[in-house]
Amino acid sequence: MTWFIDRRLNGKNKSTVNRQRFLRRYKAQIKQSISEAINKRSVTDVDSGESVSIPTDDISEPMFHQGRGGLRHRVHPGNDHFIQNDRIERPQGGGGGGSGSGQGQASQDGEGQDEFVFQISKDEYLDLLFEDLALPNLKKNQHRQLNEYKTHRAGFTSNGVPANISVVRSLQNSLARRTAMTAGKRRELHALETELETISHSEPAQLLEEERLRREIAELRTKIERVPFIDTFDLRYKNYEKRPEPSSQAVMFCLMDVSGSMDQATKDMAKRFYILLYLFLSRTYKNVEVVYIRHHTQAKEVDEHEFFYSQETGGTIVSSALKLMDEVVKERYDPGQWNIYAAQASDGDNWADDSPLCHEILAKKLLPVVRYYSYIEITRRAHQTLWREYEHLQATFDNFAMQHIRDQEDIYPVFRELFQKQSANQSA
């Protein structure tokens, strides 16, 4: 008997290649569906998979068929409605059930298909969600490239020192080798033992045949025992390799207004923006630190859980958060070694005399040392003094960006606008 071992990478997922091709082919339609679906999710359910629907017209394949024009003479068996030279009306398209999108009027005729719906995984969802996004102005810190390497596990190797030997992997290889080398002999041994048992109970006794079988069985057992328990071919050693440390270190400051003017709906939109930002950073970069700052009249550095779930509130002094950020930067993040980013979310309501101070802190202390500072204002009201002060900063500093969010549907487009990957010419 011949044995086939399937060593293909996608042996259990044979449609993976076709699935990836489908995702590439209909990426535009899938991304459009994802951008619509993300606004319908709860704050805590942003990073799960998604059911994606694509209009049937977008996935229809071109096909060759006979046109409806011209004159043709045909004979169709079983016809009891028409005779020769009758004219057949062209079928009416569009009907009521043609598209399945639920946008048309009811109709008594017409045919169609529902939109094509399929499920994408969490990884596929996040890849498409954050495609073409990047931290702006990310630069490599040159002195971080000098002789900084870190040892990483890199699988197993057949050569190495005894101290790195992997006992478990070596024994697994030994068992596999012995099983493969003795499989045929063991099957033959089992057949001979069965035959010997049958002959030993037969009448009259077949002594010569029984002796021959015993001799062959002994020879097979000897051959099986000769296969070494462990061989140098089986040995596997833990492999290590040195990889250079990432030369770009980055820190993201998240500044969220939690004052009394921020109602629950506004806070939820701010949290949704920051959850998108957190997923984007953790998905795209491996060595980005995040500093969370909540503020009302006073600012406080908090952990991730308190940032998203704390109920503390109060008045509004935005400059308190900017002062705290400046202190943390000076204490922990040297601009010569770190790429510093900040994302600030507020409803724009601030003590009037404090807005010029915010302008001064940003212009003199923060914007000269950060790579990129983004400000989103979540409000349906008219802009106030903070927005106007920040407009002056945007006109002066290239690394300052500001966007306005009115409704939940604006969050993802604004997020993509703020972190759209720059072209080579723009980044230069």
UniProtKB/Swiss-Prot annotation:
Classification via InterPro entries: UPF0229
Extent of Basic and acidic residues compositional bias: 78-90
Gly residues composition-biased segments: 92-103
One Pfam match: DUF444
Disordered as annotated region, ranges: 78-111
Family: Belongs to the UPF0229 family.
PANTHER family tied to this protein: UPF0229 PROTEIN YEAH (PTHR30510:SF2)
Protein's recorded name: UPF0229 protein YeaH
Source species of the chain: Salmonella choleraesuis (strain SC-B67)
